[in-house]
Amino acid sequence: MGDKESRASYLLAMPETTLTDRALLRIAGDDPRGFLQGLVTQDMASVVPGAPQWGGLLTPQGKALFDFMLWAEGDAILVDCEASVAEALARRLSIYRLRRAITIERSEGAVHWAREGGEGVPDPRLPALGQRWIGDAGAAAKGWLAHRLSLGVTEGLAELGSDQTLWLECNARELNGVSFTKGCYVGQENTARMHHRSKVNRRLVVAPLGEAGDRTRATYPELGLMVELRRVEALGDARVPDWMAAALA
């Protein structure tokens, strides 16, 4: 069997687990943890091998710009983010680098997901989301989007927006995406104020919609703001997810 045939057989045998819309940034150099500690919503002390954490980079007003997973890789940190915004995120982080000897660059490898199984570690936002790990790229995962939305979990630029949605309105508190004990970071003041006053007036929720005619309903403030219409089969009835109901009880 030739090299091309061998490679084709190998790829066909690989499980369909790669999240092809994700990319990895590697932050290394002079204390990357300390660099990120003053920027992101997550406490970098909790980012240890085998325990990635979900967090965000906010505006000074506490609105989401980027969300991502943070992975420990030796002394470096891997940022698992949307591929479409990876370059923009790298540029944004570089603004804060100043003269610190920090490198921010694309990393090889791919992000993988499986709904269940022994591979990887539980998604830090919600264990029901499944397992997540980093490895060589393979066949594209199937079912991730529908599974995530069926659990009422939002992520990414299209759903969270950029400088549109306050971080706690993204359900960051309920999905373990913020530390209230770590100290200062960009957007911390407004985020902490909302938390301590227990005042989150709006929240992102996932609800199935009908055909395009239902788009007009989103123009009425009393019905809420629809950030994006996505067609996904078998989402089920609109409801407050169990994890959110339990957190708000």
PLM region descriptions:
Residues 2-249:
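Basic, glycine/lysine-rich polyanion-binding surfaces/domains
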